Amino acid sequence: MTQRTLHGTVLKKVRTSGFRSRMATKAGRRVINARRRKGRAKLTV
């Protein structure tokens, strides 16, 4: 049986690339605005 190699952690994902962590920094806010301009359905994870 093959082994699953990717074990994602939801909490870690949210802390690094969630909405509130994006809004906390200037660069993160730029990311959000760029995704809004592009018309992304999902801004963050």
From Swiss-Prot:
Gene3D superfamilies from the entry?
1.10.287.3980
An example Pfam family from this entry, by short name, is Ribosomal_L34
**What intrachain disulfides are recorded?**
none
Reading the lineage from the top rank, the first entry is Eukaryota
Subcellular location, principal: plastid
Which InterPro entries has this protein been placed in?
Ribosomal_bL34
Entry coiled-coil feature ranges: none
Any one Gene Ontology MF annotation carried by this entry is: structural constituent of ribosome
Which UniProt keywords are given for this protein, alphabetically ordered?
A: Chloroplast, Plastid, Ribonucleoprotein, Ribosomal protein
Q: Which GO terms describe its biological process?
A: translation
- Keyword field contains Chloroplast: yes
UniProt subcellular location = Plastid, Chloroplast
One Gene Ontology cellular component annotation held by this UniProt entry: ribosome
The family note in this entry says: Belongs to the bacterial ribosomal protein bL34 family.
Could you identify this protein by its name? Large ribosomal subunit protein bL34c
Species, as recorded: Emiliania huxleyi
